[in-house]
């Protein structure tokens, strides 16, 4: 079948696929990454974020301590107003590395001040190379060593300090009310807008890669784009459950996740397990499609497969992807809220893979 050039994207897309799925040609990400509020009955604070990089500070928390022995150097690096891809490019350039030699536990926001650990081969570290690296808007905070490379997911989570400027006069009270409700029912675990790219076109590129209609040399970028399409499908699944009042309810055949240990299990008796969900001990999960994903059953499977079918794809498209399950909710812990002269300041921790912008959407509704 012949392919046409998408008017929005620099790659070819099947005309049949666009005809079946017109949203793929220009996905409306405002309708997919979280513009549905669990706390819709509570007024938001309004305001603006990220007016300055220092308004959005992120500190990565490692999953484990480092042994200070081994063939990998672990660099705690601080970056300012730098995307993760540009950040990695700087490291590669000045430490003379291939892309796959740079290990990251997670991706970070661009317009922010972020600190995160990066692993590189120990043999590539020298004082002169590190000096050149620090001239690129990057600061080295600490150097340690370990026996293995950092990989995606090797973090406990992130600590955030965020300033909301020009918020409503009642912002502090409004934020507290919203946070209390989210702590009771859980925070929707949507993927945030940064997952989908500045133009919102990463999911379409990811789909084209899956369909063999787009090629990309960089392994890191390929993984990012394919993951973005899977993230969109997860968001659609979560939104559908919220619309049907199934956000905090368990369905027959759900794959539930334990918040304390991360273990997953099949829900065969929803009524029996629901009290644990009400206490936020467990939550239903959504699909991250791939060969290792544990498939839901019964009613839960029907809902997930309906979303997939609505996009014109089948599970076979993801046969080469790893796959997993992602909790629909986050058990939100303590959030510190303080009204300051500059605005409303929030401090909180989120587990790995969760997005501060989703919490801010609920609080600000701006």
List each model region and its residues.
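Non-catalytic, substrate/partner-engaging modules appended to enzymatic cores
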Residues: 11-366
